[in-house]
Amino acid sequence: MNKQNARHRRGLKAKALIRKTGRSRLVVYRSGVHIYSQIVKSDQLGDKVLVASSTIDKELRSSLTGKSKVEQASLVGQLLGKRAKAAGITQVAFDRAGYKYHGRVKALAEGAREAGLDF
């Protein structure tokens, strides 16, 4: 089993546990260059994206130049939190998709908490 498969398996286990809580999930995807986050509501018909933000958002693009990836992730989390508050979402479950809670993933979570999300 390689690293990606192991991360995927960890993520599936976590997703199954989070779905039982009934809360919306704050899902993180981390690529080599960008970081993406979505708040997803799960139900029997499937998943629905309620709010999203990433480093390729037009709102953030100009303010990200010259910043490290960790700083960029924090700004993405803050933008996601701001959009979630505007949509009436205050409580979520953090689905880190098998990634370690460290670096960019941690910075995104802390940025979202600063913006008022509770998880």
From Swiss-Prot:
Function of the protein: This is one of the proteins that bind and probably mediate the attachment of the 5S RNA into the large ribosomal subunit, where it forms part of the central protuberance.
Species the sequence originates in: Legionella pneumophila subsp. pneumophila (strain Philadelphia 1 / ATCC 33152 / DSM 7513)
Cellular component GO terms held in the UniProt record: cytosolic large ribosomal subunit
InterPro entries in alphabetical order: Ribosomal_uL18_bac-type, Ribosomal_uL18_bac/euk
Oligomeric and partner information: Part of the 50S ribosomal subunit; part of the 5S rRNA/L5/L18/L25 subcomplex. Contacts the 5S and 23S rRNAs.
Domain of life: Bacteria
The protein's name: Large ribosomal subunit protein uL18
Keywords, ordered alphabetically: Ribonucleoprotein, Ribosomal protein, RNA-binding, rRNA-binding
Tagged with keyword Ribonucleoprotein: yes
Pfam families: Ribosomal_L18p
Lineage of origin: Bacteria, Pseudomonadati, Pseudomonadota, Gammaproteobacteria, Legionellales
GO molecular function: 5S rRNA binding; structural constituent of ribosome
Keyword Lyase: no
Record family assignment: Belongs to the universal ribosomal protein uL18 family.
